[in-house]
Amino acid sequence: MQVNGEGNNLDAFFEMIDLIEDDISEMLENENSELSGYECLVISFNCLTLFCRQVEIDFSQIEDHFSESEKTKSGENSLGFDSSIDLKEHNEVEAFNGMLEGIENTLASFEKRCKKTDELFDEWNCVFIMYTCLRKYCDKTKVNYGELIDDVSKLQSNLEKEKQTEKEDTKSLN
């Protein structure tokens, strides 16, 4: 995912969503893989935090903005995200895929709204919308966000260690 300008960043953002969907589909097709809604959240937050790093968005700023917006609003849903998914009617992965579709619909609605108003349709707002939807999903499914983000950090740390080991192995072969 190469990111240079704002347009490219938006393209990369939507590519990231497609990659999340592809990763989940791939894991579902693998007979040896068991996938739950929690793993889907780990995949999504992993991709989202990596994207933020690539486009130099401070992820903690997104978290802080979300916390502030939660304090100031009185239960309203200004983004138009439908968090009414009935988790009892779906398995966890189907419910998560439905939520991803909801994110895409929310982003499309926001883009239309931006064309009519002075709001900016950029990668920061897209990240914030996705983050908000994922956090609302965590709340709805009673997933502990702090533990989830710790798991994402551990995953990223392990991937970095693996990447470093591969580089060292490649150097020693030459």
Which residues fall in each region the model found?
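Charged, low-complexity interaction regions
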Residues: 25-38, 56, 112-122, 142-146
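Short, charged, amphipathic alpha-helical segments
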Residues: 37-43, 121-131, 149-150
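N-terminal targeting leader peptides, primarily classical Sec-type signal peptides for secretion
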Residues: 1-3, 73-76, 173-174
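Asparagine/serine/threonine-enriched low-complexity, disordered tracts
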Residues: 4, 8, 14, 30-32, ...
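Repeat-associated, polar segments at repeat-unit boundaries in modular proteins
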Residues: 45-86, 134-163
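Short amphipathic alpha-helical heptad-repeat segments
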Residues: 9-22, 92-107, 123
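Long, intrinsically disordered low-complexity tandem-repeat regions enriched in serine/threonine/proline
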Residues: 3, 14, 36, 61, ...
